[in-house]
Structure formats: C-alpha cells, structure tokens
C-alpha cells in the first residue's frame, strides 16, 4: 500500500537459509513492519524440477511448520520476459562489439546453460531444455553483432555417469 518493497534472498545450501529469512520476516511482522505479501523469484530464468521446484519444496516445508503464512506468489520462470532477454542481448552484443573493436574475429558464440540429466526431461517431462532453447532463440534472434547461424547452444556441468542433455 505504501509502495515500500523489501528485497531479501535465501539459499538452499548456504546461509541465509529459507528458515532464517522466514524468521526475520516473522520478527518484522510482529513489529508491524513486515510485508503482508511475498513474491518469490527463484534466480533461475528457466524452470526445472531440480532448481525451481526444489526451492518451492523448501519454502513449502518451511510454511508447513509455521502458524503465520503470508499471501505469496512464486514466479516459476522468466526466460521469455523482455527485461531478461533484452538485458542479455545488450550484454552479449556489447561484449562482441568490444572484442571486434580490439580486432578480434568472432567465429562462433557459444551460449551455455547448466547441464541436466536427460532422464529429467525424457522421463519426467521437465521443461528445462525447451525453456533453454527458447531463451537461446530469443537472444540470438535479437543480436546485432553476430549472425544467428554463428551461435551454438551447449550445456555444461556434467557430473556422474548418467546421460546428460547436449
């Protein structure tokens, strides 16, 4: 109502943890200064069970222990938003232009996404690969300093013996 927005962050694997941030919110609420609505934005543009869903699970687990539960909304992906795509294009285009001005030739631009086990997509129907592909297409189609056909999509961070998306 007063236009005040408070931004906090929480992590699953390191401090500040979800429960710590929630404790702080409850303390503020008791003082009459806490937000009445929470907007949860996981910092992964593309939805994946292993990232976004696990964050939602952690929040739900924390909510199940509490008496006061705020109104909340979860943004499950933002890979197609103009702000995300346009900012990505600006960053990539400016770096390419900088390299070209230094006399460097750009033969290929590789846009990488975090890797994921293939079973999550094939067996479970996870949207991650599709979201990554959409992100890749939306960015490369707007780039001014390199042709789309000189852009390649790849995945990184493979771990273990399972088959990973490529």
Q: What does each model-identified segment do?
A:
Residues 1-166:
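Extended amphipathic ligand-handling, pore-lining, and cofactor/metal-binding catalytic surfaces
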């Amino acid at each position: 109502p007063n236009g005040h927005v408070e931004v906090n962050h929480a992590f699953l694997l390191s401090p500040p943890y979800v429960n710590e941030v929630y404790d702080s919110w409850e303390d503020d609420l008791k003082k009459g200064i806490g937000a009445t609505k929470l907007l949860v934005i996981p910092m992964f543009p593309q939805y994946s069970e292993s990232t976004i869903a696990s964050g939602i699970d952690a929040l739900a687990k924390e909510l199940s222990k509490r008496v006061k539960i705020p109104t909340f909304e979860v943004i499950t992906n933002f890979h197609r938003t103009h702000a995300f795509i346009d900012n990505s294009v600006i960053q990539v285009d400016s770096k390419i232009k900088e390299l070209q001005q230094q006399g460097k030739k750009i033969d290929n631009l590789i846009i990488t996404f975090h890797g994921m086990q293939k079973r999550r997509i094939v067996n479970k129907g996870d949207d991650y690969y599709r979201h990554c592909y959409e992100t890749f297409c939306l960015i490369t189609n707007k780039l001014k300093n390199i042709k789309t056909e000189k852009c390649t999509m790849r995945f990184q961070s493979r771990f273990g013996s399972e088959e990973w998306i490529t």
